[in-house]
Design a protein with these regions (language model features):
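Positively charged, low-complexity intrinsically disordered leader regions
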Residues: 1-58, 62, 130
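Short, conserved loop/helix-junction motifs that constitute active-site signature segments
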Residues: 151-152, 176, 256-264, 286
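Rossmann-like adenosine-cofactor binding region
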Residues: 201-281
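Adenosine-phosphate binding glycine-rich loop
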Residues: 264-265, 270-321
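Glycine-rich phosphate/diphosphate-binding loop of Rossmann-like nucleotide-binding domains
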Residues: 50-65, 144-229
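Phosphate-coordination loops involved in phosphoryl transfer and adenosine-cofactor binding
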Residues: 39-45, 152-155, 264
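Phosphate/diphosphate ligand-binding glycine-rich loop within oxidoreductases
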Residues: 38-143, 275
């Protein structure tokens, strides 16, 4: 197998078959947390944070360790990036020492710049535009509740709320790659960028999926297999909650809205969740919620992704399955 450097910067960096490989590997890691250890040595993986994190920090830190490696966790305050060092300079230095870079940051251009100067895999752990690691965990969760990865193509998934945010973008692209029927619903002024919708529709045409963007929450949820939402207010906007939340109340996931979905529909939320706002307690703490499975699967999906990317970079086919 010829070595091939690959990064995961946005959800369509994997094609349909590659996404299936990663998800199937994630399920194997769920059954055996030490299934493979590509970083045995230990080899270091740099895990950078420009934003606060609970699930991403813990899942990548524990995940790299379980893969046999050493997670070098660096916060913005402890990095020269926080003092204005060019991304390219940081990338060149880390590339000499670490076997991969995971970065939770703001602009998408920053992870793209990191990848440009890296000879090891770079993973987007969240930017303002995309959250591909979360989507892999979410799809793993659906697969585990629906009889396997092959059944993802039969699923209708719905995202409600701020349809212009990174989660909406990633559901559109990742769902299209999976061949799902993807629906996103949000108020006017909070709909996805036309270029992302166009990319999703192009991919869906190849995989047998479909894309619907609407302002009608009830239309979106009708007969859905899985309903997703996210907080209405992003990090740093908490002081504006009362103002920012006004357009979103019609998109709250409650029992009335869930009743429009299929009777066995799943509910997922990337967390943190604000009960009584984007979702009611009856839903997130109810029998249709698989939120805690979803949160755990961040660990397994990210380990699978790092293993798969490392296998590609090293030309080691044994790490791909």
């Amino acid at each position: 197998m010829t070595p091939e450097l690959r990064h995961m910067l946005r959800d369509d960096d994997l094609n349909h078959e590659e996404q299936k490989q990663v998800l199937e590997l994630a399920i194997k890691f769920h059954h055996d947390r030490f299934y493979k250890q590509p970083f045995a040595g230990p080899q270091a993986v740099a895990v950078l944070f420009d934003k606060p994190s609970t699930r991403t920090r813990s899942s990548f830190s524990i995940g790299v360790a379980e893969l046999g490696g050493y997670p070098l966790v660096i916060d913005k305050s402890g990095s020269q990036l926080g003092r204005g060092e060019p991304v390219a300079d940081t990338a060149r230095v880390l590339d000499r020492m670490a076997y991969g870079v995971v970065w939770r940051t703001f602009g998408q251009d920053r992870v793209e710049e990191m990848a440009k100067y890296s000879t090891h895999p770079v993973v987007n752990a969240l930017t303002d535009d995309f959250h591909p690691c979360q989507i892999l965990a979410d799809f793993q969760t659906i697969a585990e509740h629906r009889g396997g990865v092959d059944n993802l193509k039969n699923q209708t998934i719905v995202y409600l709320g701020d349809a212009a945010n990174n989660m909406s973008n990633s559901y559109l692209l990742g769902g299209a790659v999976a061949g799902m029927d993807v629906r996103v619903a949000g108020p006017y002024g909070y709909l996805p960028r036309p270029d992302i919708v166009a990319d999703a529709k192009r991919i869906a045409a190849e995989t047998g999926g479909s894309i619907l963007v609407t302002t009608d929450a009830k239309e979106a949820v009708k007969d859905a297999d899985c309903v997703f939402t996210d907080t209405w207010v992003s990090m740093g906007e908490e002081a504006e909650y009362a103002i920012r939340s006004k357009p979103f109340w019609d998109y709250q996931v409650n029992t009335e809205l869930m009743a429009l979905a299929k009777p066995d529909a799943l509910f997922q939320h990337c967390l943190p969740a604000y009960r009584g706002k984007e979702v009611t307690a009856e839903v997130i703490d109810g029998p249709q919620s698989v939120v805690w499975d979803e949160a755990e699967n961040r660990l397994h999906a990210q380990k699978a992704l790092l293993t798969w990317l490392t296998g590609k970079a090293r030309g080691d086919e044994s790490l791909l399955a």
